[in-house]
């Protein structure tokens, strides 16, 4: 019997999860998003055609796969309808392939207004959120005032609850942030206009997944963002508002934790980060510019330029520890082609001179950290599109082996280009 697989990022997001999920869904029956919202940006390239998904699971392009948005996701009806419209215009029957948990909190206009107002008020100390209302929506969930998909089944009760929440937000927007208010009637009209679409896809996700498990159907859980952006384990406060780590699968989907069999960590061959926050290996020189341009390091969601740097094995080891990683998928190896030298950060030197091999938690404790590098020869030959490990340049193979050695985790998949075909699977996660 095959295994249930989690795919998640080991760094600060943007590792290339979407492509890997799309590739592996060939064997999965269910693909589940279990955290985050439309702040994610998963780019798929299939036969040269590019698709960017923000909220809908990457399995949606597969005919025989059921895509699920589970309870751990905060759902923007506006973003969902836009994404569905784009896919349906291409002939993809989204409503036949996708299901939604009734427990998903909704992201509405007042969440976006609050997100934008807060970031503006922070000024130079801004977190660097996407401004899409993710954080405020998770706040409402924890404060037990969230409006959820299931609330749409009773429109009168929904309208009453919405009025209370809009009043609460408008008071803050006006009196604390000196920002414009949100129009209650407009918010209500907008959500009720699409309520039938959302309620038409509602299912008890936990029940569905448990039944699927008993039948032996294969499941894949698609993480968004990356481990180092986890609300608990990331570089706080420069983090996202959800649990991006493997522990979020059980709470965010309702599948029992014993039924997760294999955790695949996606690790980019170098490091990137969007927005503010610690980044010890960040490069400000020509190499950093080379990685940004060649790697096309611009956010799929925001279009923002990503910061770039050498691979940080210390940070990746933290991801190994937190997620109990079974194996790695190494992505964007081809971006390193042509560099005379490649480096891996294997330890940090603290301001007091001590050398440590683990990451701090709070962002302020990262200040003054100096990366300690191992240097390795680069390679001039192209790795782009290579589909056999022994066909890679020797120096590239040594680089991969060194990553395995310093992290203690095998590289089971290597990606050498954006297309799903430009991948070598050394060990299939479903059979590992």
UniProtKB/Swiss-Prot annotation:
Keywords: Cytoplasm, GTP-binding, Ligase, Magnesium, Metal-binding, Nucleotide-binding, Purine biosynthesis. It comes from the Bacteria. It holds the Pfam family Adenylsucc_synt. It is found in: Cytoplasm. GO terms for biological process: 'de novo' AMP biosynthetic process; IMP metabolic process. Pathway: Purine metabolism; AMP biosynthesis via de novo pathway; AMP from IMP: step 1/2. Binds 1 Mg(2+) ion per subunit. IMP binds at residues 14-17, 39-42, 130, 144, 225, 240, 304. Its EC number is 6.3.4.4. Mg(2+) binds at residues 14, 41. One of its GO terms (molecular function) is adenylosuccinate synthase activity. It is an enzyme of class 6 (ligase). GTP binds at residues 13-19, 41-43, 306, 332-334, 415-417. Its cofactor is Mg(2+). InterPro entries: Adenylosuccin_syn_GTP-bd, Adenylosuccin_syn_Lys_AS, Adenylosuccinate_synth_dom1, Adenylosuccinate_synth_dom2, Adenylosuccinate_synth_dom3, Adenylosuccinate_synthetase, P-loop_NTPase. GO terms for cellular component: cytoplasm. It catalyses: IMP + L-aspartate + GTP = N(6)-(1,2-dicarboxyethyl)-AMP + GDP + phosphate + 2 H(+). NCBIfam families: PRK01117.1 (NF002223), purA (TIGR00184). Homodimer. This is Adenylosuccinate synthetase. It comes from Sodalis glossinidius (strain morsitans).
């Amino acid at each position: 019997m095959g295994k249930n697989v989690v795919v998640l990022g080991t760094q600060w997001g943007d590792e290339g999860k979407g492509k890997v999920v799309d590739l592996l869904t060939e064997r999965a029956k269910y693909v589940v998003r279990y955290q985050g919202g439309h702040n994610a940006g998963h780019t798929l390239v299939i036969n040269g055609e590019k698709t960017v998904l923000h909220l809908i699971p990457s399995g949606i392009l597969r005919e025989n796969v059921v895509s699920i948005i589970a309870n751990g996701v905060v759902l923007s009806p506006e973003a969902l309808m836009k994404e569905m419209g784009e896919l349906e215009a291409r002939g993809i029957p989204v409503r036949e392939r996708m299901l939604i948990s009734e427990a998903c909190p909704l992201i509405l206009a007042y969440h976006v207004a609050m997100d934008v107002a807060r970031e503006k008020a922070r000024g130079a100390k801004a977190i660097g959120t996407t401004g899409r209302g993710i954080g405020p929506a998770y706040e409402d969930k924890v404060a037990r005032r969230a409006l959820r998909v299931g609330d749409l089944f009773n429109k009168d009760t929904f309208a009453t609850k919405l009025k209370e929440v809009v009043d609460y937000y408008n008071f803050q927007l006006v009196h604390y942030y000196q920002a414009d208010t949100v129009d209650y009637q407009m918010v209500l009209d907008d959500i009720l206009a699409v309520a039938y679409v959302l309620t038409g896809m509602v299912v008890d996700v936990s029940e569905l997944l448990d039944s699927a498990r008993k039948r032996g159907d294969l499941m894949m859980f698609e993480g968004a963002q990356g481990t180092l952006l986890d609300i608990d384990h990331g570089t706080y406060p420069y983090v996202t508002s959800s649990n991006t780590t493997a522990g979020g699968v059980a709470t965010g989907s309702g599948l029992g934790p014993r039924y997760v069999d294999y955790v695949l960590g996606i690790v980019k061959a170098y490091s990137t980060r969007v927005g503010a926050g610690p980044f010890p290996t960040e490069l400000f020189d020509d190499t950093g510019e080379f990685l940004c341009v060649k790697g096309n390091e611009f956010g799929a969601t925001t279009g923002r330029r990503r910061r770039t740097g050498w691979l940080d094995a210390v940070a990746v080891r933290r991801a190994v520890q937190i997620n109990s990683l079974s194996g790695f998928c190494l992505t964007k190896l081809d971006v390193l082609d042509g560099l005379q030298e490649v480096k891996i950060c294997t330890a940090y030197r603290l301001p007091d001179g001590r050398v440590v091999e683990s990451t701090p938690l709070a962002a302020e404790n990262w200040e003054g950290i100096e990366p300690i590098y191992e240097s390795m020869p680069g390679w001039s030959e192209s790795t782009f599109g290579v589909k056999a490990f022994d066909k890679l340049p020797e120096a590239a193979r040594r680089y991969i082996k060194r990553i395995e050695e310093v992290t203690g985790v095998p590289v089971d998949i290597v990606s050498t280009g954006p297309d799903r075909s430009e991948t070598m699977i050394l060990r299939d996660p479903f059979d590992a």
